[in-house]
């Protein structure tokens, strides 16, 4: 990757930008641009990590989403039903009036777990997703 810096423009909700700026100040970043570069590097590293998840795994997928967004709840349920053979359990609770937190506990092949997580993350209204996996240990 070259050293040339590219100028880009992005649109963000004001509340998200304010929170980002406060985080940058607390962490001592010299500029918003450096914070965005760091966030993109972290995002890319996470994507690379997800590509390496292979083999039999136990996992949790933690999701925060806006349940007032049209279709988010039904789409989430439809996707989960496609992976019903992998999902052991899920827990759902309301954080606020329009904000829900859900944890899905599952077991399956790493590639399928990642596929499920990526499909959920692509739903409009999903604000946060965290995937945690543990390789299955074989008893010998």
Curated annotation (Swiss-Prot):
Alphabetical list of Pfam families matching this protein: NikR_C, RHH_1
Binding residue positions for Ni(2+): 81, 92, 94, 100
Cystine bridges: none
Cofactor binding annotation: Binds 1 nickel ion per subunit.
InterPro entries: Acetolactate_synth/TF_NikR_C, ACT-like_dom_sf, Arc_rbn_hlx_hlx, CopG, CopG/NikR_regulator, Ni_resp_reg_NikR, Ribbon_hlx_hlx, TF_NikR_Ni-bd_C
Required cofactor names: Ni(2+)
Keyword list, A-Z: DNA-binding, Metal-binding, Nickel, Transcription, Transcription regulation
CDD domains noted in UniProt: RHH_NikR_HicB-like
GO MF terms held by the record: DNA binding; DNA-binding transcription factor activity; nickel cation binding
GO biological process, one term: response to nickel cation
Top-rank lineage group of the source organism: Archaea
PANTHER family: NICKEL-RESPONSIVE REGULATOR (PTHR34719:SF2)
Assigned protein family: Belongs to the transcriptional regulatory CopG/NikR family.
Name under which the protein is recorded: Putative nickel-responsive regulator 3
Organism listed in the record: Methanosarcina mazei (strain ATCC BAA-159 / DSM 3647 / Goe1 / Go1 / JCM 11833 / OCM 88)
Classification lineage: Archaea, Methanobacteriati, Methanobacteriota, Stenosarchaea group, Methanomicrobia
